[in-house]
């Protein structure tokens, strides 16, 4: 059956009473059974029915635990026996035991309260302590119910719900007990299950922390759970341990996850529950021992496993068997059902459960200290002792011996008094429990709860320990080896929860560390307890958080509780040693004597485990910052540390593990208050030195009065000290900026008079043992060496498969573009963006690598041409700063004038402007012959307004309607209006032909696509077009003479026009005029007289949008130009004849750059303006994909002419 969610537990079962077939016999009944359990009826609430309660208690913590226990008992008696009689029997047994336990725990509670009131440390926690005591007693009471239920054996079946049920039982039992104490009686028990047990159970199982519940509430104590077992003894320690969640109680959180445990008890009753019973006996047995007898202890044991008889037998089993069980518990906590750990736990719990009750009361409020004082000894059950012993054995077999002697001595002195004290409040109860436990062979450890028990009945604990050791040996050297390996592996992680419980888990190792911590934390409380075994338990309890954590690590509960336990690092060993040396000695004496006999002398792997444990312990303590807490530890703790330290000198020698009693005295002598101090490693030394050096330099820099000293702080010295920097003067001066150099020069001048680098001030600033160079490493002087420009992360052009230009070439030019753009761009990002755009344009315009190289070179020249604009300003500014002797002695022009006979190599360049430029340009005017050769228009001698061209070849087609395409050379027919008769696409090459020398001759190719002559054109137009300018020579105008003042000149202008194809050929669409200052004086779009067929945007840059709103006609432009120009005005242009033909203007005073810079092959070849600018002026023009710009071309012509004049002037001189 699936476990019930408990939705119907508040509804009375219709078959429970008055049913014709008798009371409800369904074990899975989801309804409430009233009167199922007398004492638990009021508290059980919805769990009254034994079967249903049993089924639900594990999962529904709210249900009263007494019913759960009954139900568990009923189920435990037989897996298949679910008869109502069994349930009734369980109920009766529970009732009787509950009453007995209530009485006994009331007495124990009073005693515990009195004892808790005694210790000063417990006083502040008295309220909590009393409550915790109730919880502790309730735990013991819980155990007693377990014992009562154990005969029923019905509890064993309950293991299905064991994780939760035990938790519930504990909760109910503690509730009942605590309430019984308050109210005193079964009624109190009933009340607790209802109010306390269920709420606590619900909250705790939900949180998954039975263990926590046990520590804080008595109800969890009454609950029986393998986890609760530890919580029972743990409750004395519960608060701390629960917080740590080292034990199963926390495991009970895992217990809900531990539902497998419930299943586990069901399938292997004896296996899973036997272990629980063992742990429970250890935990809860002491209360029973006090009240009932070993029998009661056995009953609780049977409760946990569900096999009462087997548990009693186990209790009475040989010490060897119990030792084996304890070893199993310690080393294999995961095996919940293993009985071997039962003896250990039983012996431990018997003495400690009453004390645990008191301790639990204390722990919730004060934590470890309260636990230690009030019920630490009691709370440390024999199982805890055994676990501690085992842990200590593992830690250092030699140390246990020494400790035993020392502890025995201590016990003799202070133990008698503290024992009396501890026994006073708790001793009475603890002693009966210890006696009872001693009576039972398995519970001989119970003597430990009583102060005399550990010492006088030390053989009892020793015997169990010996049994443990013997059983451990029996268990298999393999297991020990596994434990060692696990302890080694787990020793690295200091978290007990992570460790496995079978091996000396790191949790156990860590538990030892926790002991040390707890000892430091609760040293005061242990002082009250130390003489008594309870003080040992108090040590464990102070450690109980850790020691129980260790024990729990060994025990199934600790498996579950282990993860929570890790938060509470203190280990039982360390805390016990620190809390009470005497009690620790008692524990160590008992445990280590047995271990020494059986383990230490034999070549047992445990020795290595102990050595490793000790080593890891020291490391853990250091890592966890326990050093600060350890100094106040008691002498006993010091001895314990001494025993630990003895291993360090001879870590690799086994002899160190076999420390003999005589060595113990030596150990205390060299025992450091803190874990043995080890010399720092080389890395630590270097790190510390570096930190100190940095602090030293930082403080000195702050104290430095002037920034100049900071700049020269390379020499790290006192602020006012003068330093000599002979060792690093040049690099710093060379790399430092100008301001820094001045500061350095000043500081160096001071340093020249200062002491040597090894002067005393410098030594005082350096750490002892550190080279003086350390000071220089701290100085940030290398900053001066860093370049002024930050390293720029340049973009990378992605590789393109099959690209027309190699990526490497593109990347090289992109880097060059970025460098040039950085010179005039305001930011790096702007420069990168501009360079990327320029490179992208060049790549898009280049169909081949050769063309890309040309375009890239031109682009680079253009970018370089933009830089000089800013350079002159910088040079002037820098020149102003220079003050030389010549300027001072000779005046303003002294630095620029030479008084020597030798003339300067470079002549002084005159400014070319105005009349000077005009006069110089007259030398470059085209002659009449040149005008005719280049096709300039002349006035027609016969027709006014007509023009004549002397180079025009008259090609008169036979058919007047036939035209020849000027782009592809195809003949096509036109109508009278000039339109094509037939629509036909035009395939042409827009580039010029270029001849290249190849092997065996010359090769002519088109520049646009590098195709051979005669190949199909690379561009496509909608129709054919014609030039038509030379055929339409009408409408020309001629410039005329104008009178000018004597000082004036006719003017110099650069002219450029853009044309588009119309139905009658090329016509003017834009005109631009630029003066000598490169300023545009006239620029306008012109509307053609005929319909535009092709705007020729590639070359003209004119688009349809530009001419939409244009109303200026050619006649308007002619009028403007005639008003601006005269017959003597010099016009500059490239192939200016084409522009004059488009303007239909006749002008003979021109300077043509195509003639000024002729082609090497002569006419008709001409060099392009773009190439001229790139070759002579290192500037790139016409690189805009949108087409040429007439203003750019005009300005380029003006630059070329002026440059030509200056160059010629140099040669003529």
Swiss-Prot record:
Keywords of this protein's UniProt record, alphabetized? Coiled coil, Exonuclease, Hydrolase, Methylation, Nuclease, Nucleus, Phosphoprotein
The answer to keyword Transferase applying to this record is no
Tell me its family: Belongs to the REXO1/REXO3 family.
Q: Where is the composition biased (Acidic residues)?
A: 510-519
Q: Which gene encodes it?
A: Rexo1
- What name is this protein filed under? RNA exonuclease 1 homolog
CDD domains in alphabetical order: REX1_like
Q: Which organism is it from?
A: Mus musculus
- GO CC annotation: nuclear body
